[in-house]
Amino acid sequence: MIRICPSILNADRDNLPSEIARISGESDLLHLDVMDNIFVPNFTFTFEESKKVIKECPIPVDSHLMIADPDERAYLYAKAGSASVTFHYEASLNPMQTISRIKDEGARVGLALKPATPFQEIASLMEHLDMLLIMTVEPGFGGQSFMLDMMDKVKQARKDIDSRFFGKIWLQVDGGVSLETIAQAAESGADTFVAGSAVFNSDNPGSMVDALRALALKSSAR
């Protein structure tokens, strides 16, 4: 199954409800990028702002936490109603405890890897995850170029997911996903795609979601 998750990082912040309405009918989840200006050099949403988006969004929210203290705060985003909460392995001192706290609140749990973090470093945690997020840009800003060299990591993760977990763990890519790059990611084994600039900078965001899905389906064996 292919999933398209538009990121509101590049949406019009002053008109978020209408921006979300433009893609909600075509999208599987809304990707909420939470940045604290500590773990990454950018700030996006406060927790209160995030709660408002989660509460009012007509489709499930996938909260991606680029924050320095996920061990203390990640579960709060699950408690606020996120369907899925993803935190960064690099920011966590106790990933197993954080995974458990998110699951205890009833949300799916994802683990994100920055480009420099090898897949093998988190292989032992895979059995506890619902999703693995492989960053295809350096986290912090939208509109960056897709890192094609991350496809080896995606292929490695896909092989592990299929061989050990029968394909049940979602494999997400985030960063630079567009009509020009989604095919490579799908061919490499990704099944869940975050797209920000490509969607919200287009004339018709909903149609762009459909176009991205069609390309991913055509390029994927999943």
Each model region followed by its residue ranges:
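Hydrophobic faces of well-ordered beta-strands that scaffold small-molecule active sites
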Residues: 4-7, 30-32, 61-65, 85-87, ...
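Conserved, mostly hydrophobic/aromatic
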Residues: 16, 23, 33, 77, ...
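Catalytic cores of alpha/beta
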Residues: 20, 71-79, 117-128, 177-193
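Structural motif
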Residues: 25-26, 56, 80, 105, ...
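Glycine/Thr-rich beta-alpha phosphate-binding loop at enzyme active sites
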Residues: 29, 36-44, 48, 115, ...
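N-terminal active-site wall of soluble small-molecule enzyme domains
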Residues: 31-101
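Alpha-helix-loop-beta-strand connector modules within alpha/beta enzyme cores
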Residues: 43-63, 101-110, 150-171, 212-221
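Glycine-rich phosphate-binding active-site loops on the catalytic face of alpha/beta enzymes
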Residues: 87-93, 136-145, 188-208
